[in-house]
């Protein structure tokens, strides 16, 4: 199954999260230390794997070394830990925190800038070995941190128009179907590919059809 790597990672992270959260009830510092340890270990492991295989981050080949770097749990743990912290923070603060205007503006700027740089930062850029290692090790965690800010800001009253858009009631049915679509659509895509009698010739119209259809 095309999505089995994700389900495997999610299951392992869920089991690890239960243990950490149970420990945090009585030994919070131990749990916090474990989170920091796992986060730093994930970064270090990803850097070592990237340097070992001579990985070069390129926007033209985003899934290079998929089996070595992309789908392994020890390289994907960072954003899950960030999400755990965001959830714990919202629970402890009861969605009630006070931020100054400058803090809010800086937070939104850094969040959106991080998302933009992670998506488009490799355009017309060639990273060397160490640059690629740092990018692939911290990139997923930085993406999770940027999204965590959006969640925290929206839940605490600092989301503005973005919170209004994300909370739009008409989108709620679609949001409940996203995981189902993730599980079903690869099967449809593979079945469609098996029905083809020749290669596809990519052009703008076909790209739009495939994008909105999948």
Located regions from the model:
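Transmembrane alpha-helical segments and their boundary/interface "anchor" motifs
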Residues: 6-15, 34-38, 176-184, 211-214
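Alpha-helical transmembrane segments of multi-pass integral membrane proteins
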Residues: 76, 80, 84-86, 106-214
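Aromatic-enriched alpha-helical transmembrane segments of multi-pass intramembrane proteins
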Residues: 1-5, 19-144
């Amino acid at each position: 199954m095309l999505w089995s790597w994700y389900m495997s990672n999610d299951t392992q992270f869920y089991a690890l999260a239960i243990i950490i959260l149970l420990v945090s009830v009585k030994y919070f510092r131990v749990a916090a230390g474990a989170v920091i340890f796992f986060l730093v270990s994930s970064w270090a492991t990803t850097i070592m794997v990237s340097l070992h295989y001579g990985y070069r981050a390129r926007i033209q080949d985003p899934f290079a070394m998929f089996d070595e770097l992309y789908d392994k749990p020890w390289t994907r743990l960072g954003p899950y830990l960030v999400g755990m912290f965001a959830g714990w923070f919202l629970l402890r603060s009861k969605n009630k925190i006070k931020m100054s205007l400058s803090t809010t503006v800086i937070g939104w700027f850094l969040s959106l800038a991080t998302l933009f740089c992670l998506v488009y930062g490799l355009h017309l850029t060639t990273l060397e070995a160490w640059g690629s290692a740092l990018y692939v090790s911290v990139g997923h965690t930085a993406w999770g941190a940027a999204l965590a800010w959006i969640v925290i800001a929206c839940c605490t009253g600092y989301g503005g128009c973005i919170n209004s858009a994300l909370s739009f009631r008409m989108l709620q049915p679609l949001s409940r179907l996203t995981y189902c679509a993730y599980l079903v659509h690869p099967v449809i895509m593979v079945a469609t590919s098996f029905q083809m009698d020749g290669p596809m010739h990519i052009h703008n119209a076909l790209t739009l059809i495939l994008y909105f259809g999948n």
